[in-house]
């Protein structure tokens, strides 16, 4: 009987310890309460389809992972991997020694990169890496998570800092906490100064200029919306919502310079995120679980095409265990779409669906 009591006491002690852990163990976030907008996943304009079923995958057996973004220049393809390697058709072009995310070539054929670890950097034709900016000169706040960029005809580089609080790899903390730590910034190569244009963004992600460069878009991943910041005209210096209540988490965005913005959705909206938006204490409890037991993304390719007024003109999807997912960037070159992924080993390509 005494032995049974000892076992019972140990079980009770372990049970109490588990309860204390899940209810009181410190976590590195202070979640806020918010009201998630109406779930639009079942709306007709976002209806499930198989238009991305036939994505062809390239360079998936070269030993690298996470070609987040893709650029084409002089008939060559450039991709950046999670190892820091920048690869082209000719082999390894350079290595940022960080985590290259958004990329674009400037007018002098320097490859400008939003590097999540190193900041805003430039790589010349010989593969030499140069740091352009690591903080905003207007508020003196250093970058934590430089994410995406676009370059204007005058050379100015518009880019995002996803979070001024959490660095690369802490995306989940940003999602669970839900505080506006993101920024939209601009770097002027003429003055070598960086200015903050927009503060208080909920995970500032993709950045893209309009065809006439009168405005620039920045995705707010954790709010399912895209902000428009006016650069010209009477509204210059102000911002407004371009589109909101998206059916998933917007990642990168690009313009085909013919009036279409292509938006990569990392994943459809998540039931737990929806349900727990106004339950910050519950999000703390779930964060204490092993990551494998926390909400996970599904295999779902998802891309939207928007005109410059924010109207949906393309809804491209494919949900399957064989889907190329997650798609984190999409760019159009001639009549093809090129896809990047934060975690997939290869990049994808498909003809622009009609």
Regions found by a protein language model. Give the residues of each.
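Sequence-structural signature of mature extracellular/luminal beta-sheet repeat domains
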Residues: 2-354
């Amino acid at each position: 009987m005494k032995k049974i009591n000892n076992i019972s006491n140990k079980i009770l002690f372990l049970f109490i310890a588990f309860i204390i852990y899940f209810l009181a163990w410190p976590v590195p976030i202070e979640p806020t309460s918010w009201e998630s907008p109406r779930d639009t996943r079942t709306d007709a304009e976002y209806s499930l389809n198989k238009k991305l079923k036939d994505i062809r995958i390239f360079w998936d057996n070269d030993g690298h992972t996470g070609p987040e973004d893709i650029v084409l220049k002089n008939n060559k393809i450039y991709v950046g991997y999670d190892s820091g390697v920048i690869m082209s058709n000719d082999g390894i072009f350079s290595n940022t020694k960080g985590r290259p995310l958004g990329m674009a070539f400037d007018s002098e054929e320097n490859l400008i990169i939003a590097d999540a670890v190193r900041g805003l950097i430039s790589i010349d034709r010989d593969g030499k890496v140069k740091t352009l900016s690591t903080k905003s000169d207007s508020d003196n706040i250093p970058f934590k998570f430089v994410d995406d960029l676009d370059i204007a005809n005058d050379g100015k580089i518009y880019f995002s800092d996803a979070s001024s609080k959490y660095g690369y790899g802490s995306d989940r903390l940003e999602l669970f906490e839900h505080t506006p730590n993101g920024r939209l910034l601009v770097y002027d190569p003429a003055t070598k100064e960086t200015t903050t244009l927009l503060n208080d963004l909920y995970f500032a992600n993709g950045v893209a200029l309009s065809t006439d460069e009168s405005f620039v878009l920045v995705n707010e991943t954790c709010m399912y919306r895209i902000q428009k910041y006016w650069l010209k005209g009477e509204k210059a210096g102000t911002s407004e919502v371009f589109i909101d209540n998206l059916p998933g988490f917007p990642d990168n965005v690009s313009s085909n310079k013919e009036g279409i913005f292509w938006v990569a959705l990392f994943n459809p909206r998540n039931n737990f995120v929806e349900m727990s938006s106004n339950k910050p204490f519950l999000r703390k409890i779930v964060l204490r679980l092993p990551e494998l037991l926390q909400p996970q993304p599904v295999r779902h390719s998802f891309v939207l095409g928007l005109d410059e007024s924010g109207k949906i003109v393309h809804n491209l999807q494919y949900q399957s265990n064989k889907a190329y997912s997650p798609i984190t960037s999409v760019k159009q070159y001639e009549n093809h779409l090129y896809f990047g992924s934060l975690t997939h080993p290869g990049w994808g390509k498909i003809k622009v669906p009609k």
